């Protein structure tokens, strides 16, 4: 009677798809080489036949070799290709042939390595394509099976074991497995050994059962060392753990085991034990016993003796068709989790080809404080989220007005009703609506400004302390306010705390984007200056306040494209700073001559920086569509970042700030700017102008 085999059916746990996605994004990238994957199967006596023979792939199958109790391992490979066209165009038959031969089943049987890894007899291959944008996974399992020529036929089917025999066999097999590698657990030899006068049974090892024989279990390799010598054929069993529950049809891996029996054992008749029992129900016999025969006929042989036989094994669907399966993971995923993975996807794709050394975590884990939630603040926050930043905090004391939504992308019309929502609160809410995974909060407060008298000392001190704590709790501080004097205190605090301070300011068709110099870890002076280092006067209410300005001076009157351009360059500058080994202390790029063109160009520092240059300042001129990279050293008389100012702030804290806000010339005198001004005036007075004033009264003026 011809023998039919129960094929495997694949069963993938959902976490496996996530693990495969992460492996593709973070590690494999464009590499589509086959990777090992662990498969598991088990005898399921209670399963209906059509639900049996399941090859399970767990969530940790790509990273773990752990085999759960009661399961048998199978050696798998997965080839995750880069495009759906690669999947469609793959030569499926060649892939199946390769998975059955090269270093796998056929080669292992011929060279004997199958004895070390019998689990290869139940091996499988997965061809897959993961659409990481739509979370769909196209895959196709193959369970390579070598055909025997001529085919094995069932000549006899002995009765099942008794409950007592099954119990003894199960216990003996369990003992044997403890001392053997789990790759051997699915295939073994079993024999009945009856005591004789020459070989009496050892009383100490005698079983408590009343069976007249003892079960002995051996590895597949022991056949060649005489495991069955002296044992009657009816007591010899070449065995495998069978996941099939069909009454007459054994599991798929028996095909490969029978090829081993023919080529290694040189048998044309064999008794097969399809082991289907388990320890929990060992008193209920389930195993199937088959006596198979394959008469060798040289004329029937269709392949050369050393040529790999016919291979089949691609999985069929529930309708019996040879076709791939598609799983849509999006329907199983929490929307927030989908958003979380999607946000990171485009960033991680940068590392596949363009910037493999890009450190995305350095950007993602940077906590950003945005002082100002207006035009600059709203654009900057969106771009920070685009880079994957998860912590964004707003500080602003203004409300959304009707003129804001068209220029500030986090607000809309309803935010202007009833006096307008507070910008800081609404901006943080809007970020969370856009991406729930962001940690965003808003604080409504006025930043104490140099030159603005204190009207409520308690409230001003409270704002000072809150700002101080916020700066300490964040890594990068963005100065995005409307006025110059409002940037002074955060500049001092950021410098004292050693934070990265990013600054942007707008004109009608111009902008400046810059990073403030950070004091090196060795305590030396900062090489680069801050926003105030080019000033010869301290910021003050008399010069910079909006009180006495006309409407066009009070509003941010700029071309609409200036703010998004400045914001994008500011965020990209931060990303470049975070990729530099020195972070905020990175030097400005230096000019050198290009040997080929002869032109001056900025050097990338370091040469392998994944994002290019790390400039100090970028000045943009929209009217001419130009940008300039410039740098300026720190100024030892700067009103904000000079050592005298920073040290006074560190020593006296609020008292220093209180004095700076109330005494008009305190900062100018302390920083040394006042002395610079006096010396400049003295020098101007000392200049001798070369002019001849004598006789001028008598001369006629020249007529124009």
UniProtKB/Swiss-Prot annotation:
Single GO MF annotation: Atg8 activating enzyme activity
CDD domains registered for this protein in UniProt: Apg7
Record: active site: 555
Region of interest (Homodimerization), residue spans: 660-699
Organism domain of life: Eukaryota
Species classification: Eukaryota, Fungi, Dikarya, Ascomycota, Pezizomycotina
Disruption phenotype: Blocks the autophagic process. Leads to fewer aerial hyphae and slower mycelial growth rate and fails to produce any conidia. Also reduces the production of sclerotia in cold environment. Fails to infect wounded cucumber leaves and shows only slight virulence on wounded tomato and grape fruits.
Compositionally biased intervals (Acidic residues): 687-704
One GO CC term, this protein: phagophore assembly site
Domain comment quoted from the record: The C-terminal residues 660 to 699 are required for homodimerization, as well as the interactions with ATG3, ATG8 and ATG12; and the C-terminal 17 residues are required for the ATG8 lipidation. The GxGxxG motif is important for the function, possibly through binding with ATP.
Main location: cytoplasm
Protein name according to UniProt: Ubiquitin-like modifier-activating enzyme atg7
Subcellular locations according to the entry: Cytoplasm; Preautophagosomal structure
Stated family: Belongs to the ATG7 family.
